[in-house]
């Protein structure tokens, strides 16, 4: 499971004017390690900060509209905190969990079940129950990755199902983190959306495009949710 859902807005980017990209700089005391150009017209900046616990790492997501979200995971890829910069709401992991997500368990056994809570700074508590399974290996832009299948259900504190997500993702053993893939999500109203956040290019320091905040892929496509059962 992607450890921090991007929560990105749907974008219609037809006819947009290209903007000259500047190299993004992480906060003071932090080091930008990799820029990842993704499908769905998004680009991710992966960085680490000296003040954090060993193994913690951050990601900042950009669309054509700018910085939209940022998140921190730990060495086990647990959701430590996530901020939607459009709404301004931050969610944090409740450290008391029935079954924390564990990257080491997934890589050792091939599967990992999880059942944990997050709480927002507005007081909303959400329960997340799901599973990750390894399904094979793949190489994208020279980066060796394990492919995964995941399922995730998110419930309100009262026990109502709010959203169900199923799909495929990728995990890097070297980098210790997940990358998005193709997924289907259905909310409590029955509305279904299909998205593809798969990585396309992994860009390291010194390479062209490192730190760029301008997405390169799928930006001339109309990104819309498809109703269940198909339809125009």
Q: What residue ranges belong to the model's regions?
A:
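An acidic-aromatic
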Residues: 51-109
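Extended soluble regions of mature proteins
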Residues: 143-231
